[in-house]
């Protein structure tokens, strides 16, 4: 599903790129008719319309969750990566569902969102563990939990915001993928070296 969404976006971007280079052919209009519009204003309207569509697509991409975004590894198929198991994200979705089951929503906890767009972009496009700064909870809003309510799964999430928890899970799952990929490539190199 994510691959088809990525293909649709790719086709849309290619269409926009090609559309700017094409020239619109004017329709034959009877001179003096009330529907006659100068050719230059048609081009301006079309470019404004295309700009609005592009902005909407970009905003829609920003609204999607990281699990919905297509990865470059899944959209590009090369002979080098032909042996990769395409179901490698199954563990990541299990972590995500486990996270959702363990979340406890409390009105006393506030989530601070950083306005630093560079960190946000780095977290989205790079390794989240490199730029992760830890939970951002406002002072005095920590929830006190009695010892009866604490268990091994809930204690690790009690002071984290939802965004922080998701970023941690993404870091874990991408780290597992990276580790598996390193093992696979080193095994391939050893087998090629022995031949």
From Swiss-Prot:
Signal peptide positions on this chain: 1-24
InterPro entries attached to this UniProt entry: SPACA7
Keywords: Cytoplasmic vesicle, Fertilization, Glycoprotein, Secreted, Signal
Compositional bias annotation for Polar residues: 64-78
Consequence of changing residue 25 to W: In a colorectal cancer sample; somatic mutation
Nucleotidyltransferase in keyword set: no
Function comment: Involved in fertilization. Seems not to play a direct role in sperm-egg binding or gamete fusion.
Descriptive protein name: Sperm acrosome-associated protein 7
Organism annotation: Homo sapiens
């Amino acid at each position: 599903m994510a691959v088809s969404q990525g293909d649709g976006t790719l086709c849309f971007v290619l269409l926009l790129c090609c559309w700017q280079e094409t020239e619109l052919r004017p329709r034959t209009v009877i001179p003096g008719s009330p529907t006659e519009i100068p050719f230059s204003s048609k081009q301006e309207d079309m470019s404004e319309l295309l700009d609005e569509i592009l902005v909407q697509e970009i905003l829609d991409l920003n609204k999607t969750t990281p699990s919905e975004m297509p990865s470059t590894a899944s959209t590009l198929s090369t002979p080098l990566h032909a042996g990769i198991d395409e179901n490698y994200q199954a563990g990541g979705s299990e972590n995500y569902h486990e996270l959702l089951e363990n979340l406890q929503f409390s009105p006393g906890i506030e989530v601070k969102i950083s306005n630093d767009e560079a960190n946000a972009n780095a977290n989205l496009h790079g390794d989240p563990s490199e730029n992760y700064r830890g939970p951002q909870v406002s002072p005095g809003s920590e929830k006190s939990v009695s010892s009866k309510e604490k268990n091994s799964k809930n204690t690790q999430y009690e002071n984290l915001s939802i965004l922080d928890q998701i970023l941690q899970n993404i870091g874990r799952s991408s780290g597992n993928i990276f580790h598996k990929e390193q093992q696979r490539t080193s095994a391939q190199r050893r087998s090629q070296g022995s031949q």
